[in-house]
Design a protein with these regions (language model features):
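Active-site beta->alpha loop and helix N-cap motifs at the rims of alpha/beta catalytic domains
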Residues: 1-58
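Catalytic alpha/beta core domains of metabolic enzymes, predominantly
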Residues: 39-40, 44, 52-138
């Protein structure tokens, strides 16, 4: 919460968070965690960071639907390996909010992610090889 408040104070555009790690928590606890972070920075947009292979918890459609009730949730960074997740989050987000952003995470899936609806990508090598990814984006 302290980092969320600080982030808002310094003027970030959005805050992203993975679910709590180590202990596997029920979905209502993950929603409460994300909503508490979002509430700590009430004037800042929130991005759900779905990276189940490292966080140990996948963003399910039921948890996603619960998070769509939070008006500050504007996007998902999807780093799960099934690219179909991008389509599901995009469609459900658009249905719930009218506008919704989905970022592709895995660098190796950038082209596939963009082809099936990701609005952009946030990845480890994008900043190291920006020309390549800009060209791929064309």
């Amino acid at each position: 919460m302290e980092l969320a408040r600080h982030s808002e104070e310094v003027g970030v555009d959005a805050i992203a968070s993975i679910p709590p790690i180590y202990f596997r928590l029920p979905e209502y606890s993950i929603a409460a965690y994300w909503n508490a972070i979002s509430a700590a920075a009430p004037n800042t947009d929130f991005v759900i960071y779905n990276i189940p292979q490292l966080a140990g918890t996948a963003l399910t459609m039921s948890l996603f639907a619960e998070m769509m009730k939070n008006p500050k949730v504007v996007a998902v960074k999807n780093s799960s390996m099934p690219t179909q997740d991008i389509q599901m989050f995009k469609a459900a987000g658009m249905a719930a909010k009218g506008e919704f952003i989905v970022f592709n995470g895995p660098d190796e899936q950038f082209v596939a992610g963009r082809a099936i609806g990701a609005d952009g990508g946030i990845g480890g090598t994008y900043g190291v090889m920006p020309e390549l990814f800009l060209k791929l984006n064309e």
